[in-house]
Amino acid sequence: MASIFTKIINGEIPSYKIAEDDKFYAFLDIAPLAEGHTLVVPKQEIDYIFDIDDELLAQMHIFAKKVAKAIQTAIPCEKVGMAVIGLDVRHAHIHLVPLQEVGDLNFAKEKLKLSDD
């Protein structure tokens, strides 16, 4: 069965796309820690990020870097933090979160409530 991220990539579930190329897709998180919280996923469905072959993993980080630079341009923040957790969705992904302080990358804190606008 396809992961929720594969369904998003295939357009079966709507998303707010930030960037895309032939191997990766970046979109806004539906339960963000901060405005601009973005997920970067490989189009190839791989459960565990450390099972991704070295070349694709390096390319994923380069893609994530480009997305992070764009986020930092669009969202006023000190830096863009990066996290990999991998327990909630069985499809490897990187979280990119605009940060003002270290505590902004706390996944246990309450998520933002955003409108559809």
Where do the language-model regions lie?
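HIT superfamily nucleotide-processing domains
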Residues: 1-117
